[in-house]
From Swiss-Prot:
Keyword Transcription regulation attached: yes
Superkingdom assignment: Eukaryota
Entry function: Mediates cell growth arrest in response to cadmium exposure, which is essential to maintain cell viability. Regulates cadmium stress specific genes.
The bZIP domain, residue ranges: 264-327
Induction behaviour: Ubiquitinated by pof1.
CDD domains: bZIP_Zip1 (cd14705)
Subunit structure: Interacts with pof1.
UniProt feature, compositional bias: Basic and acidic residues: 133-148
Region listing for Basic motif, in residue ranges: 270-288
Feature: compositional bias, Polar residues: 244-262
Protein name as annotated: Transcription factor zip1
Region (Disordered): 133-165, 238-277
Keyword DNA-binding: yes
Length: 330
């Protein structure tokens, strides 16, 4: 607990009827007065004589009673023995208030005086005075009586609700038949309860006890034995034709439209692919033809050149032969 003078002033800033507030005093005076609590020898002092009058729960007197205060002071000056006895009583009260927390925490000498926790001092209890007037006692007694009446009414209403619910549940259980009992009657073979319409005819007939056979008892104990196991071969799955027949014509028309649209789209894609492939083939064919034509022209030109060369060579050969023959004749 932070025990600084300012924080202590804020904690002590309590408002009560006919009691002075800390705002009426200067903060410096209060700080000086509260610094006394940090003194380790606080118990040897008299805080009641050091603090101002009308503080710490002492009711301030009105201005008209100043003369009476002066008279009391004069009486105290005349009787110093009474004053000393009163001071001793005050010291004992202060020591009793401070001794309980100190004994709980430990020795006063070992504790740090600055960190003493004054939470043990309930200032509100010291400042508030108990009101023993008849009016307050009557109010509290009337409030207690009202609270007791309300609690008794609430408990009685709860008991009534619970009892009514229990009665309703018992009546409904009596009115409604038990399903398990009914099933037991059906399985064992007991006679059904006669209705009001058929009561006359049933009363005329003599009652007979039901004859329970060994087979009925076995059927009741093992109800699954009465049912025959179905043949798996006889169980046939529904055929596609029945499934198609169960379909509505609107669904068939929608499906045909969807399939036709898909087919048209596929056919268009095929046509586009075929046209593109044929165009590519034609272009390649034209290129090959152009190349063949070029090669043919080049070859024809070469053939013509070679033919002219051959002719020239033949002429030279003949001319050389003519030159050689006359020389050979000689």
């Amino acid at each position: 607990m932070d025990f600084t003078p300012n924080s202590a002033i804020n904690h002590l800033n309590l408002k009560f009827d006919d009691v002075p507030v800390s705002d009426d005093f200067s903060k410096d005076d209060l700080a000086e007065q509260l610094n006394v609590f940090t003194n380790p020898y606080f118990l040897d002092l008299e805080p009641s004589s050091m603090l101002s009058e009308g503080y710490y729960g002492f009711v301030s007197q009105p201005s008209g009673s100043s003369n009476s205060n002066k008279q009391e002071k004069n009486v105290q000056q005349q009787n110093p023995e009474k004053i000393s006895t009163l001071q001793q009583v005050k010291e004992e009260e202060v020591s009793n208030t401070f001794s309980a927390p100190l004994n709980a925490t430990g020795n006063f000498s070992s504790a740090n005086p600055a960190s003493i926790d004054l939470a043990y001092l309930d200032l509100q209890k010291l400042l508030t005075l108990p009101d023993h007037s008849k009016e307050t006692q009557e109010k509290t007694s009337s409030q207690r009586e009202l609270f007791e009446q309300k609690s008794s009414v609430a408990s009685a209403s709860k008991d009534n609700v619970s009892s009514s619910s229990i009665l309703q549940g018992s009546a409904s259980s009596k009115l409604l038949p038990d399903q398990s009992a009914r099933q037991h009657q059906v399985l064992v073979g007991q006679t059904a309860i006669p209705t009001s319409e058929a009561s006359s005819s049933i009363n005329n007939t003599p009652l007979q006890a039901p004859v329970s056979s060994f087979a009925d008892q076995n059927a009741f104990t093992n109800p699954l034995s009465t049912f025959a196991s179905p043949d798996l071969a006889s169980v046939s799955s529904p055929s596609l034709s029945s499934y198609k027949g169960a379909q509505s014509p609107n669904a068939n028309s929608k499906r045909t439209k969807a399939t036709s649209a898909i087919r048209t789209a596929a056919e268009e894609d095929k046509r586009r692919r075929n046209t593109a492939a044929s165009a590519r083939f034609r272009i390649k064919k034209k290129l090959k033809e152009q190349q063949l034509e070029r090669t043919a022209k080049e070859l024809t030109e070469k053939v013509a050149i070679l033919e002219t060369r051959v002719r020239e060579l033949e002429m030279e050969n003949n001319w050389l032969k003519g030159l050689i023959r006359p020389t050979s004749n000689f």
